[in-house]
Amino acid sequence: YEIRLSLVGSEMCIRDSDKGDLLDLRLLMGADTLDSLLPQVLAPLEKAGGLFAIPCGTPSVSCWFLDQSSLESLGLTDVPATYADLMTLISTYLTDFASDSDVALADNPGGMADSLFQQLFWAQLARCEASGVQPTFTDADFVAALRQYIALRPALVDYETRWLAERSSSLGDLGDTGGIVTVLSVSSSQPSLLHLNTSLTPSKTDEVPLLLSFSEGGALLIPMTYSVLAVNRRSAYPDDAASLLSYLLDNQPYDAKLALLPDYAALQPNPAYTEAAQKILDDEALYMQYRATLSPLEQKQAEDILTDARAALHQIPPNVYSAAEIAAYHARLNHAHLLESSFWVSGDQHVSTLRQRLLDGECTVETFVQELTRIVQ
């Protein structure tokens, strides 16, 4: 290959650079291009002053959003601050509201139980990395959260199953008019922090991100990963490869630029707004050109049409994201932690088997966390 695309864990990139398989992009692309990126984005890809990969595409993150309007409609007020709080909220919903509420637990509960387990796993891994310690899963607050999850899981899986069955049969007894929790499932191939339309911004104004820790006052971290590009040291065309990487970096989607460039705050015009505004200008010019030839009634009709068009224009956002959305995006990004370890995305068979044994009741929580710690260390 000339250019390699892979998913961070950066361990994989550093391993390949140690073997001499990757070119140092600082020498190849120039510091000015690369130093414009967020330092925390580049740090896991650096080794001994060299940079051996660059990010590509919008990050994938693990984060749920809370719909405050739905929460209040259920007579609840407390926004979860810890994973224990979140699981208590889910348990309260399943016990008190699931059978007869018009508010669904989530906008898409399918796979929610597995997503929650994954989120706990990633959050503990992120906490260890951010603290500079080896991955461990024996911390008391993580073990307590895992116990709470194991107790909650059967009811949550049952809710998922019934919700999906009733939704597919159009009965809708569990409701689909809104979600108390918006589930943002994270995929290794497609960034999924929002539904499918934005990045770290909520889909509705009354949604708030659940920035959770394992204990009160603990670190608020959003585990994050993204794809990276690297250049084969044996490439016959390193300069061409560097030019292509520079082009890809400069022409990434707006979401990706927001996530990777700290100073990228320029508002991107909304094409729909631009097109509508230009049409109004064209229509106004046409009206002024022929106004003298129109009857009073025709003039009134034309002016009413223009007035309605201007009013409609005010309903279209002038930019893809507002300045406030960009600010919120970067504020949330400050809590994001780029996962450096690669085993969690590599489909480690030992981890998968151990997880399944835990969920099937074939091993205790104590055995699980001890064995998991042994595997990852």
Language-model regions, residue ranges each:
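Single conserved hydrophobic/aromatic residue that forms the stacking wall/gate
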Residues: Y1-I14
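Hinge/lid segment of periplasmic solute-binding proteins
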Residues: E11, R15-C63, D206-L212
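Extracytoplasmic/periplasmic solute-binding protein
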Residues: K47-G57, S62, D85-R147, G178-S187
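Short helix-loop capping/hinge motifs at secondary-structure junctions, enriched
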Residues: S70-V79, R234-A241
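Short helix-initiation/N-cap motifs at beta->coil->alpha
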Residues: Y83-D85, E160-G178
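Glycine-centered hinge/linker elements that transmit conformational signals in sensory
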Residues: I90-S91, G132-S169, L200, K204-F214
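Extracytoplasmic/periplasmic substrate-recognition and gating elements
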Residues: L200-Q289
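C-terminal capping/gating helix-and-loop segments adjacent to ligand/active sites or protein-protein/ligand interfaces
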Residues: A285-V376
